[in-house]
UniProtKB/Swiss-Prot annotation:
Induction details: Repressed by GolR.
Matches recorded under InterPro entries: DUF6905
GO CC aspect terms: membrane
Recorded superkingdom: Bacteria
A family per Pfam: DUF6905
Disulphide-bridged cysteine pairs: none
Sorted UniProt keywords: Glycerol metabolism, Membrane, Transmembrane, Transmembrane helix, Transport
Official protein name in the record: Putative glycerol transporter Lin0367
One Gene Ontology biological process: glycerol metabolic process
Cited function: Could be involved in the glycerol uptake either via facilitated diffusion or active transport.
Length: 113
């Protein structure tokens, strides 16, 4: 993997949590619940397309194992929350649920992929 591909992959991983932190809450504040649905469609869809869905995508897949964009979003938003004064102890239950859900989802995908 070249330096350019590595930097593009890092930037692609940064892009998703950054877009979530910058836009999702504002869309919900402006348009209510429908803003959350619109954010889910526009932010996730656009960033997925940039990272994976075009021929020269930002994220380089080097093998058969893949990491979902949710990992980047979770780590990025979690870190940003801690840096802005969030408490780690309040997030333990959510982190545990996310890990269990990720393992379960990965297992289910492994059954047919």
């Amino acid at each position: 993997m070249s330096i350019g591909i590595a930097l593009a992959t890092i930037a692609g991983g940064f892009l998703f949590p950054f877009a979530i932190r910058m836009m999702w809450g504002k869309m919900v504040d402006e348009w209510g619940a429908i803003g959350g649905w619109m954010a889910a469609a526009f932010i996730v869809g656009t960033v997925w397309t940039i990272n994976h869905g075009i021929p020269k995508s930002m994220i380089y897949q080097s093998g058969t194992v893949w990491v979902d964009m949710a990992v980047a979003a979770g780590i990025g938003v979690f870190t940003a929350s801690l840096l802005t004064g969030g408490k780690f102890s309040k997030s333990v239950v959510n982190l545990a649920a996310a890990v269990v859900g990720g393992v379960l989802g990965g297992f289910l995908l492994s059954l047919f992929l």
